[in-house]
């Protein structure tokens, strides 16, 4: 098994991207790409669900060196909220400073339709677990203030404006899954301030902040949440709508990296 650092070669990325469900085609934006299957990387978890390729892609987006993780493992696959910890630790060890997370999410607002993009301003942990449980040391008492970096969010909003992509902002609620949320659960998280709901991202953000990485996160809205008129969430809908939104995600990421180059 290899470590990511040992395989970088001439690549020296400071930015990493984790792609959510059905967003695998975003790797088409990577120029001079080198693919490394997760199976060849020590500690990288192999995703067990469709819509997650399970490979690392090294190259450039918008002229900036990036490491793109095409797919993630979820807490519901093993019961381990820290399932992405080994991968994030290797990213940190390889020199990554900024982590951009993407995900598929259900909208808690009827006006935010499937196909929309939403920048995360914050999250609410509704999963009853935390990826830092069981780790020792005072450094695990991580501040989650500005967990989703405000400066990175401004840069993404500027990029979206240039590309004429309508991007919302909101609070992401993490449920463990794999079952979708009940209408009663959706009503509850609407009341407490949620904007979208999904099964990933929050534990990765907690781990990334523990490692000292700056984080930005973008949801692709793939369905209306349970209980909202017209909603009938399914994994097939998630994959279908995720693929539709991938084009806007590619344009947004490309413009973001061109602007920071």
Stretches found by the model and what they are:
Residues 92-95, 190, 209:
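Non-catalytic positions within long, well-ordered alpha-helices that form the structural scaffold/packing
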Residues 97-98, 195, 214:
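Short acidic/polar active-site loop segments enriched in Thr and Asp
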Residues 153, 158-195, 260:
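Active-site/ligand-binding-proximal alpha/beta "capping" segment
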Residues 199-237:
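Zn-dependent metallopeptidase/amidohydrolase metal-coordination segment
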Residues 226-261:
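His/Asp/Glu-rich mid-to-C-terminal helical/loop segments that flank catalytic regions of hydrolases
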């Amino acid at each position: 098994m290899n470590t990511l650092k040992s395989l970088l070669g001439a690549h020296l990325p400071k930015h990493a991207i984790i792609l959510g469900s059905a967003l695998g085609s975003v790797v088409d934006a990577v120029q001079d790409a080198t693919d490394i299957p997760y199976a060849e990387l020590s500690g990288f978890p192999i995703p067990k669900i469709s819509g997650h390729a399970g490979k690392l892609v090294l190259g450039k987006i918008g002229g900036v060196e990036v490491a793109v993780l095409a797919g993630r493992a979820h807490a519901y696959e093993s019961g381990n909220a820290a399932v992405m910890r080994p991968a994030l630790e290797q990213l940190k060890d390889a020199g990554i400073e900024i982590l951009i997370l993407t995900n598929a999410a259900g909208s808690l607002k009827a006006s935010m339709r499937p196909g929309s993009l939403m920048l995360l301003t914050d999250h609410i942990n509704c999963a009853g677990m935390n990826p830092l449980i069981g780790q020792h040391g005072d450094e695990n008492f991580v501040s989650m203030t500005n967990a989703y970096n405000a400066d990175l969010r401004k840069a993404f909003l500027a990029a979206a404006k240039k590309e004429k992509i309508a991007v919302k902002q909101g609070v992401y609620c993490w449920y463990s899954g794999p079952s979708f949320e009940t209408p009663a659960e959706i009503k509850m998280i609407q009341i407490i301030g949620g904007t979208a709901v999904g099964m990933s991202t929050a534990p990765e953000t907690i781990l990334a902040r523990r490692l000292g990485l700056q984080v930005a996160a973008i949801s692709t809205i793939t369905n209306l949440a349970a209980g909202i008129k017209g909603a009938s969430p399914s994994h097939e809908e998630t994959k279908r709508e995720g693929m539709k939104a991938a084009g806007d995600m590619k344009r947004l990421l490309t413009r973001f990296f061109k602007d920071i180059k």
